[in-house]
Swiss-Prot record:
Methylates ribosomal protein L11. InterPro entries: Ribosomal_L11_MeTrfase_PrmA, Ribosomal_PrmA_MeTrfase, SAM-dependent_MTases_sf. Keywords: Cytoplasm, Methyltransferase, S-adenosyl-L-methionine, Transferase. Transmembrane segments: none annotated. CDD domains: AdoMet_MTases. SUPFAM superfamilies: S-adenosyl-L-methionine-dependent methyltransferases (SSF53335). The gene is prmA. This is Ribosomal protein L11 methyltransferase.
Length: 316
């Protein structure tokens, strides 16, 4: 029996997996564990193992007190690899988890998810508008988007939180988008008044998608797009937005401090509410002053500014 997934969910995964590898079959990988015992560390461990397996995106749900994480792989994944991967996770988790994989029914997911995807209205001023739909509204700033195979369609809470946060910054100026995905945050920042941007991502497909969406909006001359991370960027900038993983944000905190001038803004998401204190601590050690925590469901977005004070060294 095939698992129940929406055309939008499967369509995005088809683009990210089958579209990339030239296959038309998908396997759904599912990890399930007790929600009341799954603290931020356990959940982040599961995300890490799923990403190591090669899942480009992971869906998260709480169903009847159970934490359920799902992702999709091409149908060419050997069963033996999956068996070894399952045992590897079970040996390292501190609580019991059910791990399985299932064949997903073959169909034209690309057409199906286009039929299902609708405009996404965010905050007070923005709307993400699929490029294949006619007549965008005239009362909002339109972000025309063709997501391709990259993350960031507005379907995920962290993308929406970052967009709301960008709306709240009075003078965006120059900025960097670290982990740009589809480029939706880069386009939004420019539409909201930013002057010039730099967008980086370690995924080649994200770089291609960001460039394409900038061209759709006629903004390609105002953004430098590169494959990589903060090593591709130079400061000082007026601000930085980064919607990636909690651990990565914490590790990059010194780099964000290097890039943003004193008084500059920072918007950080891709983290759970339970992970926020740890990330705030890492950023605060680099002079970041938290002004607001936005939330949607279990997801958080940190908004604040970098102070003029240099971070303290150990023992000072």
């Amino acid at each position: 029996m095939y698992p129940a997934i929406t055309p939008l969910q499967a369509g995005l995964q088809w683009w990210a997996v089958a579209g990339r590898q030239g296959v038309a079959e998908l396997w759904q990988v599912q990890v399930e564990t007790a929600a009341d015992g799954a603290d931020g560390e356990v959940e982040e461990t599961l995300y890490w193992y799923l990403s190591e397996l090669g899942l480009p995106h992971v869906e998260r749900q709480i169903l009847a007190g159970r934490l359920v994480l799902r992702g999709y792989l091409s149908g060419e994944t050997p069963e033996g690899v999956m068996e070894r991967w399952r045992e590897h996770i079970r040996e390292r988790l501190t609580q019991k988890a059910e791990i399985g994989w299932y064949a997903v029914e073959r169909r034209d997911w690309q057409a199906a998810w286009r039929e299902q995807w609708r405009p996404i209205f965010v905050g007070e001023r923005l709307v993400i508008w699929p490029v294949w739909l006619p007549d965008p509204p005239g009362d909002r700033l339109v972000i025309p988007l063709d997501p391709g195979m990259a993350f960031g369609t507005g379907e995920h809470a962290t993308t929406r939180l970052c967009l709301r946060a960008l709306e709240s910054v009075p003078d965006l100026g120059t900025f960097a988008d670290v982990g740009c995905g589809s480029g939706v945050l880069t386009v939004a920042a420019l539409k909201l008044g930013a002057g010039r941007g730099w967008a980086v991502d370690t995924d080649d497909l994200a770089v291609v998608s960001t460039r394409k969406n900038l061209e759709i909006s006629g903004l390609e001359e105002r953004v430098t797009v590169a494959r990589g991370s903060t090593e591709q960027l130079s400061g000082p900038l007026d601000g930085v937005v980064s919607n990636i993983l909690a651990e990565v944000i914490a590790n990059l905190a010194p780099e964000f401090r290097r890039l943003v001038h004193p008084g500059g803004w920072g918007i950080f998401s891709g983290l759970l509410l339970t992970q926020a204190p740890r990330v705030v601590e890492a950023l605060a050690g680099q002079g970041f002053a938290l002004s607001e925590t936005l939330s949607e469901g279990d997801w958080a977005c940190l908004v604040g500014r970098f102070s003029a004070d240099r971070p303290r060294s150990a023992g000072s």
